[in-house]
């Protein structure tokens, strides 16, 4: 233990001074102008950097230390104040406040360190203490912190950030540096300094403004401001560069001055590179110290007020994007798509063949839009989104190939009925050079009908021809006014020459020319779009019960002329789709007066559109017209008639009367319109055009060359659309059809961007939820983040358009920046848009920058990591299939890494996914890399920059000695004073109390540099070093935690063994302490064509090992179907396989498994009905899933399948079937080769660990509904050290509490307040339980929704936590009664809040519950998720090698014996590889000393981790025992009241530390000294009869037990501390394994759950 002495361990605290007295002054404003006081504080600190002044509680506090004697005149009236506070001198009274304490009053530090809550009757300060002293105590620490941060910032050591600062790790990466001053009652002033490296912030210089895309791969980031730390969003989230401006105005000068005053740094904005400003919108939620939903962290806000901020004063936090395998990724942006990548390909191939073959005869004219596809809509090229490209914008773009990362940046704006032209550069030469089409030939082709699709679904070409024959009359009746105003010669503007000449024409001109460049002086109307079978929206496949559907007469003939109606032109929020006239103007229902501007179209073009838009007219026809027959299809009503058009009446709530008449699009990638193709076009490469404010990358435009291609379902059905569709949302999803109508577009100001070499819209900087984003039907509820509610939808145009409509043009970049912005006055029709005539109000630049600088945001609201998995991908996978069942299907995701779930049956889902996240045996550690993080101690900036030279690092021993012992007097104290006179001053160590007196009399501080402070500091440090070397620590404050023993059963006898013996379970022939558990197993996996025989081998090995470990018996599931159900498949040998091809997505695999498990339920029910007794209802069923999918969301998807099975069992009334699940990675058991998979060699150790883990997770019985599951072992309770007499009141000081019940409960709420997770455990592992909840921000809904019980509020969660605790207390009490005749004692609930103190909204419920249940006594703790690497040895490593042989070898890795002689029996098995027994005979023939330390020479963990070597080399010493040094933990209870990491400004009742040497530090060459992992335990509240030292020691001993339970319950990796190689990944895994070895299991369980669950988006 001498190597880990407290005097040699330095902490993360710096001592900045020792104070005797502190004086403070309080100043108030005459005019109650609080802002003037704030500005005065900035000015004073800038003029006097070392002054202690702060604004708090509407007052200005000024502090001085008594030994400095700083006069009040330091705060001079002659301070030059900036222009923003010219009259500050007249507003602020610089004299003392007469109601406060007297200026210069000598207040002791103890009074400020522990201010009284109320003034006593004898107080000299009287009522003034009540009013000012508590604020003065907080203000002193606040002023010291501000002063330190200001000086460090001024010297360039740090940058202010939020309530702390950031420090540079290198040129780009920044970490948060936590600086917290502490004032002890004895006058010591300390500073805590810890760097949190888990949050990685990047400097804005990572983005090169000249060539952004070349230096920044995939820009998905969050912007934070320096110095406030406020999160901001881009003003225009569609385009990063368009937010940059170069502005030098009075407002920006004021901002620069404020930043200089607050940070002490004068930033230069002289050069062009430095003078870059960015338009940002502050996140109001973050301003209130609240975090946005982590699962949707990239989003936009409804606030339209922007600021201009220097780009150099921004920090970026990038999201983590999980790479998706190209084969399984639904990425259709590339030119090659796998033929069966879509679930509907088999059906799509047949339909596409019919469509494409018939379309050659049905083509009426060249399409008037550029071919359209899903990829063109969902891909983000050039400028995507609202206002990113105005009607007069052209951009030259270089080819840009999308990689997998680009998927996360694509946003779909076409859900909001907003239109935008596409530049002519995207027209390929093949399309422009198309040969002209003869009009007569086209006329003949239009007479052909697609009979197969039209007979059933209506919308035939007869109606289209009839409408075209009468187009003139129809046009005059409906849209006569609009036609008369337009010039008639605009029809001739369609030649290729005109196309090359007029690149800035509107969207419809471009579309016409591009599709028919040689159409001459006329154009033929577009073919009418028709619905097909696959395009029936999902919401139209059911008839709402309360809706009265119109009479459907499939035999009624179609009218020659649909009855005309008058469109409501001015209704932006019309419930009906836009009419043809509206589409012809701006795509919305605007009147003619509103149709001017960028989307003003020539009337002849409108005529073309109107005549061919009978699809819109059909839906707008009179109610007297016959209605087309669209069958209502429901598949699962009757198997025989399910696909033939069976009608179904939905039982859900009804919809509006107009809703079913609207044009809707289901949430799928299949379009609903036939695509007219000519033979010529069919032979050309099809080029996709962005419809709906979209530019495309050239590389993403090339699709299949033939409609017969395997990807024709995506291309043929979507690529060419009639123009009526190009003016409406092409894939508007059914959830949004009811809420959103058309939105007007204002003039974008005519900005033209030229020579832009990058795809700027690929930068997604917070645009999720914006009009340009892919907010689709499954994410409709983003209120608070998304500005697009129905109330203010008319304001959802681009903020750039708002600004430009107010003539606030963005200054242009010079050509050297790679961008050229010029002004264009061409507006199409020559008229000014309505947005220019009436500027929109409400969008303005904020001029009050003071809150953005002084409002220090709590950095704890910044998530450590956020994922981009839930950003919508390019391709919309279908959520509808032909066999779609009635249940909500959330298995199908947008892409393979999306993490999304519906709220229905969420509790069942959490019940199943919880154990797989927590008790995972470390399987998820390598894949997610989200489990453990540590706080590193960075090299001190105080030492580097010498900002405060008179300071030093505090050793641990200074906190372990009680200063009251030095201050107390005894009888001999006066008699020993002569020793002080005899001894010299330099060697006066005979009397420590006299040294402490001298130490206490020396006053100094590092904040003020002068000669006196320097001399006193050197004297103080010299005395401290002597005291540290001479004073010893007591066992009560610095002690080694005991070795934990476990209980096992051997030959029906209970044994208490070292917990290390659990690793030899099978060899020792142990049995579980409880009864055996029997269950049946069904192994689920995929068959990828490389063999499946290894699965049967693995299952046989597992069953055999489980039996050999005496844990019970596992049986295989065998179920067979009956002749009447040939659709069900038999299950044999407990294996269920699903075929998976290499080009098949895992989404398809999970869907197939889901169907097979539903069939399993039917097989079980048939077995019960037929009484074949193949299924054992008395045994639980294990679903063992072998997972080959490495994506992070695979656990989520598999758990959805398990949830569906459990729901299906409930629906089929099979409550006797009890299931539990286990997900293991395929890499654990399979060695994958290109052509053949092989079973890995699995050691008995791994198989035994897996068997014991399955025993723990198996329910106690099929009929036993106890929430507590028995574990295979329990820990041994320490025997009492003395007899406890309960009639004696000893104040709990010497009690062992053997009869009392302690239940540890750890819980945490995610920082976005959406998830709760809790874990329960007693110190012995008798009861263990975990549970998670989803805490909805909305009101809990019950009734028709059916999922109100799955979403909870805080009160409900706290109630359930308390109820579960009561159940577990009852279980513990029953266990105690069974083992002894005594009744249980008091019940103590150790309530542990992780990563925070208990906030008020939770605290109120805990108080209410504790008052209600007075039989339970609360002990409240606060801990962190992970340990911190903050303690370090002062001595270099291996400094004491000479004394190494005489030391206790504490904290040392076993080096092993060098005895290689083969003459002894022990030498025969000295190699760990030899120690493997394959039969009981080998075990019995082993030498007697085979478990001696020499048998485990090179083992670092696992079975023989760190065995103690024999001190004298004896190999047959019977006293040798196995001991794992990795389990050695030191308990520390400081005598000094230290604050908690989670609450640095609030002292707890007591604090304790768990200390463990970081073994992996020996492998790090960058650390020349030993480092120690520190885990902090802070006591916040307990009953007043507790002795705090006794209670803290008891808790630390409990935590040692709970740490041991990590391996017993299976939270850590099986062989995590056995290093296989020296790779970086292996080192990280060893590091995480070691870090988790000092964290109690229930705290690790909560962390592992929340880390995963917080990234799941719940669709409510």
Curated annotation (Swiss-Prot):
Its source organism is Scheffersomyces stipitis (strain ATCC 58785 / CBS 6054 / NBRC 10063 / NRRL Y-11545)
Please report the name of this protein according to its UniProt entry.
Mediator of RNA polymerase II transcription subunit 13
Where along the chain is composition biased (Low complexity)?
A: 702-712
Which family, according to UniProt? Belongs to the Mediator complex subunit 13 family.
Which keywords belong to this entry? Activator, Nucleus, Repressor, Transcription, Transcription regulation
Residue ranges with Acidic residues bias:
447-465, 713-722
Task: From the Swiss-Prot or TrEMBL record, state where the protein is found.
Answer: Nucleus
- Renumbered to this chain, the Polar residues biased-composition regions fall at 104-118, 592-614, 803-837
Sorted alphabetically, the Gene Ontology BP terms of this entry are: positive regulation of transcription by RNA polymerase II
Positions of region (Disordered): 94-118, 428-481, 583-614, 702-731, 803-843
Recorded name of the encoding gene: SSN2
Q: What does this protein do?
A: Component of the SRB8-11 complex. The SRB8-11 complex is a regulatory module of the Mediator complex which is itself involved in regulation of basal and activated RNA polymerase II-dependent transcription. The SRB8-11 complex may be involved in the transcriptional repression of a subset of genes regulated by Mediator. It may inhibit the association of the Mediator complex with RNA polymerase II to form the holoenzyme complex.
Q: Name any GO cellular component annotation.
A: mediator complex
Q: Name one GO molecular function term.
A: transcription coactivator activity
Q: What is the lineage of its organism?
A: Eukaryota, Fungi, Dikarya, Ascomycota, Saccharomycotina
